[in-house]
Amino acid sequence: MKKKKIIIFALLLGAIIVILVGWSVSRGKMYDYNYSEVAKKLETAPFNTNIPTKVPFEDMQLYDFGSNNQKVEFTLFNVDKEFLTVNILKDEIEYPKEIKKENIKIGRDVNGKYIPEHSGKRIILWQHGDLFYEIAFSYKLTPIEISKEQLIKMAESFK
């Protein structure tokens, strides 16, 4: 009887380890983004900008798009209702001083800021040329649904 309990415990422990390893591997994965719909919408935008070619979730689609003289904004989502909003502005994006911000590197030579939590979002900000970029992930339950590294990889994919 004792041997049977040990075998069951070992099997359960093994299953838990396999699930956790699989989750952590898939969590950091990036997916190619078919940006043709966003690129077509950008043809009418008031200024030229870069767009992401990689996203942290599979099958992201354009949900919303808007632009004016100072800003381009679009939101991507998928069937699991994971939302990413991209803002591209001519003016710097200001956040209150009391919000925790972390300095980050995007690629080799771009400095940015990472905000782990603000109003139900994880945010990354950076400047490229004369434009300011922001990616905001609206999480459903907790901020750990997306990692800082995934946001940085998405920022690095802007072309």
Report the location of each language-model feature:
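N-terminal Sec-pathway targeting helices
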Residues: 1-17
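Short linear interaction motif-like sites in intrinsically disordered regions of transcription factors
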Residues: 1-2, 24, 127
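A short, sequence-level motif marking secondary-structure junctions
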Residues: 14, 88-94, 138-141
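Membrane-interface motif at the C-terminal end of an N-terminal transmembrane signal
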Residues: 18-32
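Short, solvent-exposed recognition patches
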Residues: 28-123, 128-129
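Short hydrophobic beta-strand segments that form the core of ligand-binding sensory/regulatory domains
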Residues: 132-136
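Surface-exposed amphipathic alpha-helical segments
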Residues: 138-159
